[in-house]
Amino acid sequence: MRKKITIPEILLMKQEGRKVTVLTAYDYPTARLVDAGGVDAILVGDSAGVVFSGHENTLPVTMDEMLYHVKAVVRARPKALVVADMPFMACQSGEIEALKNCGRMLQEGGAEAVKIEGGSNMAPIIRAVTEMDIPVMGHVGLTPQSVHRMGGYKVQGRKDQAERILEDAHAVQEAGAFAVVLEGIPAKLAARITEMLEIPTIGIGAGPACDGQVLVIHDILGLCEKYSPKFVKRYADLAPLITEAARQYVSEVKDGTFPTEEHSFS
C-alpha cells in the first residue's frame, strides 16, 4: 500500500528528479479510480464548469459548486494530495475574502491545498494565504479565468510576453507557493522557468521539461469530443463505449430481453 502524498513529498520529488503526476477529478468514483492509478495529486479543477456542467468557460463556477466537488473527491480518501481550484473572484476581491474562501476549501471541503490563478498581480494574495498556513499551488501562463483578456485560449509567453511570465512564476514562488502550474506556454520557456525555480512546475501544454504534468480526466478518457487541445493525449476512448452501452440498454428494454429472471427477485 502506498503512503499518503504530502506537500513535503511533492517538494522532495523535484529535488530527486521524480516527475509529479496530476489528474483532475470532480466526483467520488473518479477520485477513487485515478487514485488507484497512482497519481500524486488530484486537482479538483474549476474545469468542472466546462466538462461537468457544460459551460463555455470556467467563469460561472461558484464557491459552493467547488465545495460540492471537493467534498465528493475527499470522501474517496485518496492517497494523492487533494488540491482545490479557487474559482473566479474567490480571491480577487482582497485578502480577507481570499482567506475566508481558501479557508473554507480546507475546513469545509477537506482539501489539502488550493490553486490560485495569476502571477505578480496575485502575489500579495498568495502571500497572505500561505502565511495563514494554507498551502497554495500557483498557476501562470494561460490562465483560463483570464480568457476574455487573452481573447480566447491562446498560447502565452511568445516574444515579449516571455519575461512577464518568468516574472510571474518567480513572484508566485516568492509569495510562498509550493508549486506552480505552467499552462499553454512554449516548451523552451517552461524549461527556463523549471530550471529557475526551486518549487516544482506542473505543466499542461508546456512541454516535457516541467517537473510534472496535469491533464483533465475527461480529455484523456475521450469524453470531450467537441474540444481536444493539442497538448492532450487520449489514453482511452470511452465516449463510443458509453453510447453503445446506452444503445444496447434501450434496445433490450424495448424488445423485452431485459430484465430477465437473472435480474429479478423471487
Curated annotation (Swiss-Prot):
What cofactor requirement does the entry state? Mg(2+)
One Gene Ontology term of the biological-process aspect is: pantothenate biosynthetic process
Tell whether Mitochondrion is among the UniProt keywords: no
Q: Which HAMAP family match?
A: PanB (MF_00156)
Query: Which free-text remark accompanies the cofactor?
Result: Binds 1 Mg(2+) ion per subunit.
Catalyses: 3-methyl-2-oxobutanoate + (6R)-5,10-methylene-5,6,7,8-tetrahydrofolate + H2O = 2-dehydropantoate + (6S)-5,6,7,8-tetrahydrofolate
- Identify which residues the record assigns to the active site: E183 (proton acceptor)
Q: What is this protein called?
A: 3-methyl-2-oxobutanoate hydroxymethyltransferase
Q: Which organism encodes this protein?
A: Trichlorobacter lovleyi (strain ATCC BAA-1151 / DSM 17278 / SZ)
Localization annotation: Cytoplasm
What this protein is reported to do is described as: Catalyzes the reversible reaction in which hydroxymethyl group from 5,10-methylenetetrahydrofolate is transferred onto alpha-ketoisovalerate to form ketopantoate.
Subunit structure and binding partners: Homodecamer; pentamer of dimers.
GO cellular component assignments: cytoplasm
| Positions bound to Mg(2+) | D46, D85, E117
**Keywords assigned by UniProt, alphabetized:** Cytoplasm, Magnesium, Metal-binding, Pantothenate biosynthesis, Transferase
Q: Which InterPro entries match?
A: Pantoate_hydroxy_MeTrfase, Pyrv/PenolPyrv_kinase-like_dom, Pyrv_kinase-like_dom_sf
EC assignment: the record states 2.1.2.11
Q: Which domain of life is it from?
A: Bacteria
Provide the binding site for 3-methyl-2-oxobutanoate.
D46, S47, D85, K115
Q: List the pathway annotation.
A: Cofactor biosynthesis; (R)-pantothenate biosynthesis; (R)-pantoate from 3-methyl-2-oxobutanoate: step 1/2
Q: List GO molecular-function terms, semicolon-separated.
A: 3-methyl-2-oxobutanoate hydroxymethyltransferase activity; magnesium ion binding
Task: Cite the Gene3D superfamilies for this sequence.
Answer: Phosphoenolpyruvate-binding domains
> What gene is this protein translated from?
panB
Similarity section: Belongs to the PanB family.
